[in-house]
Amino acid sequence: MSKTRNGLIEHCKSKLGTPYVFGAKGEILTQAVLDRLARENPGTYTSAYKAKAAKYIGRRCLDCSGLISDYTGRIRGSYNYHDTAVERVSINHLDESMIGWALWKPGHIGVYIGDGYCIEAKGINYGTIRSKVSATPWQKVLKLCDIDYTADQAPVTYHEGFQPAADGQRWWYQYSDGSYA
Protein backbone atom coordinates (compact mmCIF):
# COMPACT_ATOMS: atom_id res chain seq x y z
CA MET A 1 0.00 0.00 0.00
CA SER A 2 1.49 3.36 -0.99
CA LYS A 3 1.92 6.25 1.40
CA THR A 4 0.06 9.31 0.08
CA ARG A 5 0.07 13.05 0.75
CA ASN A 6 -3.45 12.88 2.20
CA GLY A 7 -2.42 9.94 4.36
CA LEU A 8 0.58 11.89 5.65
CA ILE A 9 -1.57 14.91 6.47
CA GLU A 10 -4.17 12.80 8.29
CA HIS A 11 -1.38 11.04 10.21
CA CYS A 12 0.11 14.38 11.26
CA LYS A 13 -3.29 15.69 12.37
CA SER A 14 -3.78 12.55 14.46
CA LYS A 15 -0.46 13.27 16.22
CA LEU A 16 -1.34 16.81 17.34
CA GLY A 17 -0.58 17.05 21.04
CA THR A 18 1.93 14.18 20.97
CA PRO A 19 4.93 14.97 23.19
CA TYR A 20 8.24 15.86 21.56
CA VAL A 21 11.33 13.99 22.72
CA PHE A 22 14.51 14.37 20.65
CA GLY A 23 15.31 11.13 18.82
CA ALA A 24 11.88 9.53 19.37
CA LYS A 25 10.20 8.07 16.29
CA GLY A 26 6.72 7.25 17.57
CA GLU A 27 7.57 4.59 20.14
CA ILE A 28 6.30 4.51 23.71
CA LEU A 29 8.88 6.23 25.87
CA THR A 30 10.26 3.99 28.61
CA GLN A 31 13.15 4.62 30.97
CA ALA A 32 15.26 2.27 28.83
CA VAL A 33 14.40 4.21 25.64
CA LEU A 34 15.10 7.52 27.40
CA ASP A 35 18.48 6.22 28.62
CA ARG A 36 19.36 5.03 25.09
CA LEU A 37 18.38 8.38 23.54
CA ALA A 38 20.45 10.20 26.18
CA ARG A 39 23.50 8.03 25.37
CA GLU A 40 23.04 8.60 21.62
CA ASN A 41 22.53 12.38 21.97
CA PRO A 42 24.62 13.58 24.92
CA GLY A 43 24.70 17.18 23.66
CA THR A 44 20.91 17.45 23.83
CA TYR A 45 20.19 15.35 26.89
CA THR A 46 21.24 17.63 29.73
CA SER A 47 19.94 16.78 33.20
CA ALA A 48 17.19 19.40 32.75
CA TYR A 49 16.20 17.94 29.35
CA LYS A 50 16.11 14.39 30.77
CA ALA A 51 13.87 15.58 33.61
CA LYS A 52 11.42 17.16 31.12
CA ALA A 53 11.45 14.06 28.90
CA ALA A 54 10.92 11.73 31.87
CA LYS A 55 7.46 13.28 32.34
CA TYR A 56 6.43 11.54 29.10
CA ILE A 57 7.39 8.00 30.11
CA GLY A 58 4.52 5.71 29.16
CA ARG A 59 3.40 7.90 26.22
CA ARG A 60 4.16 7.75 22.49
CA CYS A 61 6.68 10.44 21.63
CA LEU A 62 8.08 11.97 18.44
CA ASP A 63 10.71 14.35 17.28
CA CYS A 64 10.32 16.41 14.10
CA SER A 65 11.55 13.74 11.69
CA GLY A 66 9.79 11.06 13.74
CA LEU A 67 6.47 12.70 12.84
CA ILE A 68 7.09 11.68 9.21
CA SER A 69 9.02 8.45 9.89
CA ASP A 70 6.17 7.16 12.07
CA TYR A 71 3.93 7.35 8.97
CA THR A 72 6.33 6.10 6.29
CA GLY A 73 7.95 3.35 8.34
CA ARG A 74 11.39 4.57 7.18
CA ILE A 75 13.58 6.11 9.86
CA ARG A 76 15.24 9.27 8.58
CA GLY A 77 16.50 12.46 10.20
CA SER A 78 15.68 15.94 8.91
CA TYR A 79 18.93 16.10 6.91
CA ASN A 80 18.23 12.64 5.41
CA TYR A 81 14.80 13.83 4.29
CA HIS A 82 16.46 16.83 2.65
CA ASP A 83 19.08 14.71 0.90
CA THR A 84 16.61 12.06 -0.36
CA ALA A 85 13.91 14.52 -1.51
CA VAL A 86 12.68 14.13 -5.08
CA GLU A 87 12.44 17.93 -5.35
CA ARG A 88 13.79 20.79 -3.23
CA VAL A 89 12.22 24.22 -3.72
CA SER A 90 12.88 27.54 -1.98
CA ILE A 91 10.26 28.35 0.67
CA ASN A 92 9.55 31.52 -1.36
CA HIS A 93 7.84 29.30 -3.96
CA LEU A 94 5.50 27.50 -1.54
CA ASP A 95 1.98 27.21 -2.96
CA GLU A 96 -1.17 25.13 -2.46
CA SER A 97 0.01 22.50 -4.95
CA MET A 98 2.62 21.54 -2.33
CA ILE A 99 0.18 20.34 0.33
CA GLY A 100 1.75 17.27 1.94
CA TRP A 101 5.30 18.34 1.09
CA ALA A 102 7.78 18.77 3.93
CA LEU A 103 8.98 22.15 5.16
CA TRP A 104 12.67 22.14 6.04
CA LYS A 105 15.37 24.21 7.68
CA PRO A 106 18.69 22.89 8.99
CA GLY A 107 17.89 20.56 11.89
CA HIS A 108 14.09 20.76 11.64
CA ILE A 109 11.26 19.48 9.44
CA GLY A 110 7.46 19.79 9.35
CA VAL A 111 4.58 19.03 6.95
CA TYR A 112 2.64 21.64 4.95
CA ILE A 113 -1.13 21.14 5.37
CA GLY A 114 -2.36 24.11 3.32
CA ASP A 115 -3.72 27.62 3.85
CA GLY A 116 -0.40 28.81 5.28
CA TYR A 117 -0.25 26.19 8.06
CA CYS A 118 1.96 23.24 8.91
CA ILE A 119 2.15 20.53 11.52
CA GLU A 120 5.48 20.16 13.28
CA ALA A 121 6.89 18.40 16.31
CA LYS A 122 8.41 21.66 17.50
CA GLY A 123 10.35 20.87 20.65
CA ILE A 124 10.10 19.51 24.17
CA ASN A 125 8.38 22.70 25.38
CA TYR A 126 5.75 22.60 22.60
CA GLY A 127 5.10 19.05 21.44
CA THR A 128 3.39 18.40 18.10
CA ILE A 129 1.49 21.50 17.01
CA ARG A 130 -0.28 23.20 14.11
CA SER A 131 1.47 26.48 13.35
CA LYS A 132 1.66 29.21 10.73
CA VAL A 133 4.38 28.58 8.17
CA SER A 134 5.53 32.18 8.68
CA ALA A 135 6.22 31.50 12.39
CA THR A 136 9.28 29.34 11.60
CA PRO A 137 12.18 30.42 9.33
CA TRP A 138 11.76 27.49 6.90
CA GLN A 139 14.20 27.48 4.00
CA LYS A 140 12.93 24.78 1.64
CA VAL A 141 9.90 22.77 0.62
CA LEU A 142 10.66 19.08 -0.01
CA LYS A 143 8.80 16.57 -2.14
CA LEU A 144 9.51 13.44 -0.10
CA CYS A 145 10.71 10.27 -1.82
CA ASP A 146 8.61 8.04 0.46
CA ILE A 147 5.28 9.69 -0.45
CA ASP A 148 3.20 9.00 -3.57
CA TYR A 149 1.99 12.46 -4.56
CA THR A 150 -0.03 11.19 -7.53
CA ALA A 151 -2.23 8.65 -5.73
CA ASP A 152 -4.74 11.11 -4.31
CA GLN A 153 -4.80 13.80 -6.96
CA ALA A 154 -8.18 14.70 -8.35
CA PRO A 155 -8.79 13.10 -11.75
CA VAL A 156 -8.44 15.36 -14.75
CA THR A 157 -11.79 16.31 -16.27
CA TYR A 158 -11.96 17.06 -19.97
CA HIS A 159 -14.77 19.13 -21.43
CA GLU A 160 -16.06 17.78 -24.71
CA GLY A 161 -16.35 20.38 -27.43
CA PHE A 162 -14.38 22.73 -29.63
CA GLN A 163 -11.26 24.22 -28.05
CA PRO A 164 -9.10 27.05 -29.40
CA ALA A 165 -5.61 26.12 -30.58
CA ALA A 166 -2.65 27.89 -28.99
CA ASP A 167 -2.30 30.19 -32.01
CA GLY A 168 -5.86 31.48 -31.47
CA GLN A 169 -6.65 31.06 -35.16
CA ARG A 170 -7.63 27.40 -35.33
CA TRP A 171 -9.94 25.12 -33.35
CA TRP A 172 -9.86 21.44 -32.47
CA TYR A 173 -12.47 19.11 -31.03
CA GLN A 174 -11.74 17.49 -27.66
CA TYR A 175 -13.62 14.37 -26.53
CA SER A 176 -14.52 13.67 -22.88
CA ASP A 177 -11.71 11.06 -22.64
CA GLY A 178 -9.08 13.72 -23.49
CA SER A 179 -8.48 12.64 -27.08
CA TYR A 180 -9.02 15.15 -29.84
CA ALA A 181 -9.63 15.44 -33.57
Show where each model-derived region lies:
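Aromatic side chains
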Residues: 20-22, 112, 173
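Intrinsically disordered, low-complexity, compositionally biased regions/tails
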Residues: 27-30, 70, 114, 127, ...
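Loop/turn positions that initiate beta-strands
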Residues: 97-101
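Aromatic- and glycine-rich peptidoglycan recognition patches
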Residues: 1-18, 76-96, 107-158
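Enriched - but not universal
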Residues: 104, 141, 174-175
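Short, repeating "repeat-unit edge" segments in beta-repeat architectures
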Residues: 105-109, 166-168
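N-terminal capping segments
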Residues: 1-65, 69-74, 106-108, 119-125, ...
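Extracellular adhesion/carbohydrate-binding repeat motifs centered on closely spaced tryptophans
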Residues: 151-181
